[in-house]
From Swiss-Prot:
EC number(s) per entry: 7.4.2.11
Protein name from the UniProt record: Methionine import ATP-binding protein MetN
Ranges where the ABC transporter domain occurs: 2-237
Primary site of residence: membrane
Membrane topology type: Peripheral membrane protein
Recorded superkingdom: Bacteria
Organism: Clostridioides difficile (strain 630) (Peptoclostridium difficile)
Signal sequence bounds: none
Ligand binding (ATP): 34-41
A Pfam family this chain is assigned to: NIL
Cystine bridges: none
Coiled coil: none
Function text: Part of the ABC transporter complex MetNIQ involved in methionine import. Responsible for energy coupling to the transport system.
Length: 321
């Protein structure tokens, strides 16, 4: 669906994207997370042609974005809906008219516009607000209007640029649930740019972590949080753990075994002493997952590894970085 390879972008002599490569699959919800200035919004704008990139390739549906002429770019943007942090609604127009705007720009008939707008307002749950002006709406309702407008032309991809940053936590959850529902019902690819960790954990199947214009890592969201990867630790400012002498093993607790008493059972069955030196549990969607780092004597190391493997428990031996 979207293939980004070795993209470099400069503002004058300042490089803001550095050899960025990401593959985004059709129908997935893909997250791009990083601090302010990481380059994530710039990358998003390279995808829809709002920003030019000097080197590398951005393919959307097998079309090279920087090679498109004006008509081809216009056609591409029909395939790419976009929502923003501050909604970008026209204050003097009603909810209905705001959603209708892209349809009017592309020459749809009044009958087609009415049918499509009413369908979309039903999808986003604000049919009763169709005659209201934006000033009479809450932040969450405004973002629902923006989502409906972004979907007006039946895009294949929805780009979300910090779409929940201006919303309170409860409203954020409701908007994310709406996006998830749209993804499931319409099969639309959604790319979520955010600095909010909870957004990524709630809806993104895969994620890219960015810093200073570079991609630190790309992977399955659950796996990255489960393994507490180096890229994730760097993002959240978590320092590396200094490991004590002996054998140190990280035990991974995916959602299907996170509630089992693995450590105490193992210590009892093997008759060994186990010290827990680090633990981290994360709320991930509706589940709890995480990891523990345990310390055992070197002589018990192989015995513990064999035990964990026999129980189908994922583990990895740790060394000081």
């Amino acid at each position: 669906m979207i293939s980004i390879k070795n993209v470099n972008k400069y503002y004058g002599k300042i490089q803001v994207l550095k050899d960025v490569s990401i593959e985004i699959e059709s129908g997935e919800i893909f997250g791009i997370i990083g601090h302010s200035g990481a380059g994530k919004s710039t990358l998003l704008r390279c995808i829809n042609g709002l920003e030019e990139y000097q080197e590398g390739s951005v393919l959307v549906s097998d079309k090279e974005v920087k090679s498109l002429n004006e008509k081809q770019m216009r056609d591409l943007r029909k395939e790419l809906g976009m929502i923003f942090q501050h909604f970008s609604l026209l204050e003097r127009k009603t909810v209905f008219d705001n959603v209708a705007l892209p349809l009017e720009c592309f020459g749809y008939s009044k009958a087609e516009i009415k049918k499509r707008v009413l369908e979309l307002l039903e999808v986003v749950g604000i049919s009763e607000k169709k005659n209201d002006k934006p000033r009479n709406l809450s932040g969450g309702q405004k973002q629902r209007v923006a989502i409906a407008r972004a979907l007006a032309l039946n895009p294949q991809v929805l780009l979300c640029d910090e779409a929940t940053s201006a919303l309170d936590p409860n409203t954020t959850k409701s908007i994310l649930s709406l996006l998830e529902d749209i993804n499931k019902k319409l099969g639309i690819t959604i790319i979520v740019v955010t600095h909010q960790m909870e957004v990524i954990k709630q809806i993104c199947g895969r994620v890219a972590i960015m810093e200073n214009g570079e991609v630190l890592e790309v992977g399955d969201t659950e796996e990255i949080f489960l393994r507490n990867t180096k890229g994730l630790r760097k993002l959240i400012g978590e320092e590396s753990i200094i490991l004590p002498k002996g054998t140190n093993i990280k035990i991974l607790f995916p959602k299907d075994i996170s509630n089992e008493a693995i450590i105490t059972t193992m210590a009892r069955e093997l008759n060994i002493d186990v010290s827990i030196i680090f633990g981290k549990l994360e709320q991930f969607k509706d589940d709890i997952l995480g990891s523990l780092i345990i310390n055992i004597s070197d002589k018990s190391g192989e015995q513990v590894k064999q035990y964990l493997t026999s129980k189908g428990i994922r583990w990895e031996e740790m060394i000081n970085e």
